Structure formats: structure tokens, C-alpha cells
Amino acid sequence: MKTIFFKEHEAPRSWYLIDAAGKPLGRVAAKTAAMLRGKHKVSFAPHQEIGDYVVIINAEKVAVTGNKAKDKMYYTHSGYVGGLKSINFNGLIAKKPAEPLMIAIKGMLPKGPLGRKLLTNVKVYAGPEHPHQAQNPIAVEV
């Protein structure tokens, strides 16, 4: 029996809403990455973009356990000598509330063109408001 593959533009897609308030950072990111890839669908294929769209709200209230709020560091490099910059979790949340979640999700997606395309299907918002009411997102518990 042959395996049936969806064409990427014909694959049925849904919109999901995840409230990250008080939820662990890694669990929210793992659930989101799986939904973006489409691993919850029977038609999953690792080389296709057939996943769903995910809207995450309250990203600024995402939880980390232990001392990670002050000990977890995020590094960026400008490319110049001595251009390494570091900031801890609390500092990054204060500066860019959605960034820790985006970094965690990006790390859980495939590297390369497919992963970059999948990352465009997630929308992360710091507060409880989002502009995707018209898509009627389905609320998902993490």
C-alpha cells in the first residue's frame, strides 16, 4: 500500500491558542514545536510543512524553575572581536518579553530552510491581547 502525502498547499491547517502564563518555558516550547511541525497529525511527514499555526499569549508570564531566572544566560555575538554580549533571563524578559520563548521554539525546530519557514507560523505576544481573533484559534492546554 502506498503512503499518501498531502501537497503542502492542500494540507488542512488550524489555528491554536496557547496561554503561557505560569507554564514552564520548555513545555510551552515543546508543545508549540510539535504543533508547528504537524506531529499530532496522521499525515505527518518530516520533510513537509503541514503543521498548524500557533498563537502564544502572556509570554512575559512564562515560568522557569529553580534559579534559572537569574542564572540562565542568552548570548549574541556581533561578529567583531570582543563582540560577545550576554543577558540573563530576567533581563531579556524585561527588554523583549517574547524573545525567550521564540529562542526556545527555534531550538526545537529543524535547522535549515524548513525550520525557518515553520518559525513564521508561530505568533508570540507579551500580553493577553492578539490580533488573530478572526481565525478563531482553538485553546490548547499545556
Swiss-Prot record:
Keywords: Ribonucleoprotein, Ribosomal protein. Pfam families: Ribosomal_L13. GO terms for molecular function: mRNA binding; structural constituent of ribosome. Gene3D superfamilies: Ribosomal protein L13. It comes from the Bacteria. One of its GO terms (biological process) is negative regulation of translation. The keyword 4Fe-4S does not apply. GO terms for cellular component: cytosolic large ribosomal subunit. Part of the 50S ribosomal subunit. Belongs to the universal ribosomal protein uL13 family. This protein is one of the early assembly proteins of the 50S ribosomal subunit, although it is not seen to bind rRNA by itself. It is important during the early stages of 50S assembly. This is Large ribosomal subunit protein uL13. It comes from Treponema denticola (strain ATCC 35405 / DSM 14222 / CIP 103919 / JCM 8153 / KCTC 15104). The lineage of its organism: Bacteria, Pseudomonadati, Spirochaetota, Spirochaetia, Spirochaetales.
